[in-house]
């Protein structure tokens, strides 16, 4: 615990919080163009083919984004909306593509957690 005199001589350092998604430049989402759509494998205990896309953002950054949900319609030159949020078992993937926005279609036949996957409410859905 510093004395008052020590604080007068040298003030406390401000804590600088580093952004976990710097490519978004303090925005909630950013628009971008897919430059490459491919699959990659996760880290050690897990095994799968995860769908990812390399996206050139309007902020000038080129980032790797995860495509959530089952099936997608993305290809090169698709316009997508990118949000923050990393994928724990994919190194270097710190962004997600928003489903149901711009060129990205929502997940077909999705009945639960629909808002996260851009799926409309089915006609035969009962409350």
Swiss-Prot record:
Keywords on record: Methylation, Ribonucleoprotein, Ribosomal protein, RNA-binding, rRNA-binding, tRNA-binding
GO biological process: one example: translation
Highest rank taxon of the organism: Bacteria
Membrane-spanning residues: none
Residues annotated with 3-methylthioaspartic acid modification: 89
GO annotations of cellular component type: small ribosomal subunit
GO molecular function, one term: structural constituent of ribosome
Stored InterPro entries: NA-bd_OB-fold, Ribosomal_uS12, Ribosomal_uS12_bac
Function summary: With S4 and S5 plays an important role in translational accuracy.
Similarity-based family: Belongs to the universal ribosomal protein uS12 family.
Subunit architecture: Part of the 30S ribosomal subunit. Contacts proteins S8 and S17. May interact with IF1 in the 30S initiation complex.
Protein name, UniProt field: Small ribosomal subunit protein uS12
Species this chain originates from: Campylobacter fetus subsp. fetus (strain 82-40)
Designated gene of the protein: rpsL
């Amino acid at each position: 615990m510093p004395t008052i005199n020590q604080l007068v001589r040298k003030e406390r350092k401000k804590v600088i919080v580093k952004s976990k998604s710097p490519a978004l430049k303090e925005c909630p989402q950013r628009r971008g163009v897919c430059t490459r759509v491919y699959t990659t494998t996760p880290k050690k205990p897990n095994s799968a083919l995860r769908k990812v896309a390399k996206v050139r953002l309007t902020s000038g950054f080129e980032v790797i984004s995860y495509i959530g949900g089952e099936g997608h319609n993305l290809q090169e030159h698709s316009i997508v909306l990118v949000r923050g949020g990393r994928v724990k078992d994919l190194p270097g993937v710190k962004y997600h593509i928003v489903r149901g926005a711009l060129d990205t279609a929502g997940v077909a036949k999705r009945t639960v957690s629909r808002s996260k996957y851009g799926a409309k409410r089915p006609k035969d859905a009962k409350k």
